[in-house]
Amino acid sequence: MMKHGKSEDVFKYIEKTNEKNLYRINKGLVPGMNVEGNIYVNEKLKLLIDEEIKMYQLNKCSTFLPAVIQIANVSTLPGIVKASIALPDVHAGYGFSIGNVAAFDMNNEKAVISPGGVGFDINCGVRLIRTNLFYNDIKDKQEELAQLLFNHIPVGVGSQGFILCNQNNLDDALSLGMDWSVKEGYSWIEDKLNCEDNGRSLYANSDYVSVRAKKRGITQMGTLGAGNHYAEIQIVDEIYNKKSAKLMGIEKKNQVCIMIHSGSRGLGHQIATDALIEMEKIMSKYKINVIDKQLACTPIHSPEGQNYLKAMGAACNFAWINRSSMTFLARQAFSKIFNQSPDDLDMHVIYDVSHNIAKIEEHFINGKVQNLLVHRKGSTRAFPPFHPLVPLDYQYCGQPILIGGTMGTYSYVLTGTEKAMENTFGSTCHGAGRALSRNKSRNALSYSDVLSNLKEKNISIRVASPKLIMEEAPESYKNVSEVVQTCHDSGISNKCFRLRPVAVIKG
């Protein structure tokens, strides 16, 4: 429940700071705030946040609380440090808003872990694969490529993959992550080196994944899923930092890349559901009273907290294997069309990032190094140059950050900064962020108009479910360029290069 009856009562707790694009949620907006909230938005994006508050009060919004209230609610959780942080693509979600970063002190025995701070699609993330092809090489094969990718990569709700495994293989996969993909021949060794955490969560233990979750995952390896997940053929449209782009193998405009956005499918969803049910029942044992039951949590070091961390790690490994399997299928498709090997086509993974995850990391807090459990829900890690966890290839430019746009709009590659380490626990945005609910999109937008707009932009589209055409239209989302520019201007990430889609594959 919102504490305040009028939107004006909420707005008085939100103040603009002297720092560009930074607003503060002061203590008092909701009872029991341990820290303040920080919101990174420019003036245009701030209007969308304000509108969400007003629409909720008029009962014209989703059943979720407005993002601003959710950011404040997260600040009440035990063990949170520094601030509850919202990034420019923030919007309401389950418990935590999407676009929220929150870190908890590992040395505080009361500090918590919350599945709502990770999300249901554990390790939903983005992978970018480069090629040595240019638009002129594919423009006459664009439709053929789109259809072949659609044929190769299983899409849609409940889709089943070509990468079949038995129960024993699944347990190995959940424990090993991309090491399993390399062993089975679905990944190159170089792929895992340019992947967050080398594509393997060391927390993972498949023993803590329920039988039901495993049953949901065993047939879904190498599947895209539905909703906002996609595989896109893109071309480099603009290069902002030539030195950094060159380190990623990008040197000229019109170079062809493939972007894959997917996660842990039904397996991750079931793990999140199982943990939320268990934690909601057990919170009273630890004398935890949350302001919103969707924030169900337990102490990090409790048996329940550790069980979730191990199961979540297994889901992370599944997601990395999932994106790796689709990389394998995309390489096959391109090889078939161009009659060259994927290696000859230089189909190397530039990077693979997660934007729904919780991880133990070291950060400076008040001049001291602390071990923190950083929850990133709809936000991306943004580590700077020379950070030990940044791959060797990118030590001089910082971690690549992959920002997916919307169907028919730009995507971006950014790099991490020191300011992100100082202000946002090494985090930045993850995408555009929804502006309209799926229901509103279906009611407000025309199927034929959206298809016509894509055709005008010469974008080939393949989609399993026609309703997704409206639900995933650019009008359903915030302006991704505004989101990216806000982060760039705030110094929490730097623009490197921009891509535009020429073919879109969706569930």
From Swiss-Prot:
InterPro entries: RtcB, RtcB-like_sf, RtcB_euk. GMP binds at residues 228-232, 355-356, 404-407, 411, 430-433, 506. Its EC number is 6.5.1.8. It comes from the Eukaryota. It catalyses: a 3'-end 3'-phospho-ribonucleotide-RNA + a 5'-end dephospho-ribonucleoside-RNA + GTP = a ribonucleotidyl-ribonucleotide-RNA + GMP + diphosphate; a 3'-end 2',3'-cyclophospho-ribonucleotide-RNA + a 5'-end dephospho-ribonucleoside-RNA + GTP + H2O = a ribonucleotidyl-ribonucleotide-RNA + GMP + diphosphate + H(+). Its cofactor is Mn(2+). Mn(2+) 2 binds at C124, H261, H355. The active site is at H430 (gmp-histidine intermediate). Binds 2 manganese ions per subunit. GO terms for biological process: tRNA splicing, via endonucleolytic cleavage and ligation. Keywords: GTP-binding, Ligase, Manganese, Metal-binding, Nucleotide-binding, tRNA processing. One of its GO terms (molecular function) is RNA ligase (ATP) activity. It holds the Pfam family RtcB. Belongs to the RtcB family. Catalytic subunit of the tRNA-splicing ligase complex that acts by directly joining spliced tRNA halves to mature-sized tRNAs by incorporating the precursor-derived splice junction phosphate into the mature tRNA as a canonical 3',5'-phosphodiester. May act as an RNA ligase with broad substrate specificity, and may function toward other RNAs. PANTHER family: RNA-SPLICING LIGASE RTCB HOMOLOG. Ligation probably proceeds through 3 nucleotidyl transfer steps, with 2',3'-cyclic phosphate termini being hydrolyzed to 3'-P termini in a step that precedes 3'-P activation with GMP. In the first nucleotidyl transfer step, RTCB reacts with GTP to form a covalent RTCB-histidine-GMP intermediate with release of PPi; in the second step, the GMP moiety is transferred to the RNA 3'-P; in the third step, the 5'-OH from the opposite RNA strand attacks the activated 3'-P to form a 3',5'-phosphodiester bond and release GMP. Catalytic component of the tRNA-splicing ligase complex. This is RNA-splicing ligase RtcB homolog. It comes from Plasmodium berghei (strain Anka).
